[in-house]
Regions:
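Hard-cation-handling environments
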Residues: 3-5, 192-292
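Low-complexity, highly charged intrinsically disordered N-terminal segments
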Residues: 53, 57-98
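Conserved anion/nucleotide-ligand pocket segment
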Residues: 161, 165, 169-213
Length: 292
């Protein structure tokens, strides 16, 4: 049987304190990324990009699934998305989804998101996330599995899309949902302390992999969060997915304990801007150039 899977995406990293709101036009012409695309134009537009959706497409097609494109868009980080823009894009995706359902039953839905979820009833839903997503209990409850990127700077977006698609194919094959466990962190992590190339985050990511291997969990979604998105659910959080509730709880508790044990290490001493500029000029010397 050929699986019929809907695929789409809606990505934005919103800074609550940035002065310029994000408009619909910013999604149509984002600069550096494919512009808003829908229906038959979507797959050709995003297939060769570095975003998670491209990795999901590759895995689905390798598995012989029939992909039903909805819509996909991204805008560069800026102020909150204008209500009119959000509603317009959400309505567009929902319209494409409704048309897909009218054409025949869907076996699953994959979404390329930054940090939001879409409710699609009883149809299995997985999504890839930016780890700066402010993961909430509602997002976990209203999806089957979430797969954040594992790197910051983000160099594994396509891999995350592939992981999310594999989770969707596994969920469809299982016929029953994964057991889930959600945990919220007790403190915020500054962006400057989130780089996965160095400790403490590098050590946390290494332990995440070890916990997955030890518990046999299907996925351990760890989101560092984006502390500049000012809303009640803001903050680091994680979700574990496994074949049993015991395994999901064990994986989630272990990673949360690892993060909490490193709380002091996430506090970085930063240099005020004026001091940083002066130090850079001194370091560069009279011949320059000065690079900051």
């Amino acid at each position: 049987m050929t699986l019929r899977i809907a695929i789409g995406g809606f990505l934005h990293e919103s800074h609550s304190f940035a002065p310029c709101p994000t408009t619909y036009a910013d999604f149509v012409q984002p600069g550096g990324f494919p512009g808003l695309c829908r229906g038959s134009a979507m797959l050709p537009a995003v297939r060769g990009c570095a975003n998670a959706v491209a990795g999901a497409i590759a895995v689905a097609e390798a598995a012989g699934a029939a992909l039903v494109p909805l819509a996909w868009c991204i805008a560069n980080p800026a102020g909150p998305v204008e209500d009119a823009a959000f509603e317009r894009i959400a309505a567009l995706i929902c319209a494409e989804l409704s048309a897909a359902l009218e054409a025949g039953p869907l076996d699953g839905v994959y979404l390329d998101l930054h940090g939001a979820a879409l409710i699609v009833g009883a149809i299995p839903v997985t999504a890839s996330l930016d780890p700066h997503a402010n993961l909430t209990l509602q997002m976990v409850e209203e999806s089957d599995a979430l797969a954040p990127y594992l790197t910051y700077p983000h160099v594994d977006m396509k891999d995350a899309g592939a992981r999310a698609m594999r989770l969707l194919l596994d969920r469809v094959a299982r016929g029953v949902p994964f057991a889930k466990a959600f945990r919220q962190g007790a403190f915020w992590i500054p962006i400057t302390s989130q780089c996965t190339l160095v400790d403490p985050m590098a050590a946390v990511m290494t332990e995440r992999a070890a916990i997955l291997a030890r518990t046999g969990a299907a996925e351990l979604a760890w989101c560092f969060a984006f502390p500049y998105a000012d809303f009640p659910g803001c903050g680091p959080a994680l979700a574990a997915y496994a074949g049993t509730q015991e395994a999901a709880d064990a994986a989630a508790d272990a990673l949360l304990a690892t993060v909490h044990s490193r709380e002091g290490d996430f506090q970085l001493d930063v240099v005020p801007a004026a001091e940083a500029v002066a130090a850079a000029i001194r370091e560069a010397g009279p011949g320059g150039p000065t690079v900051i």
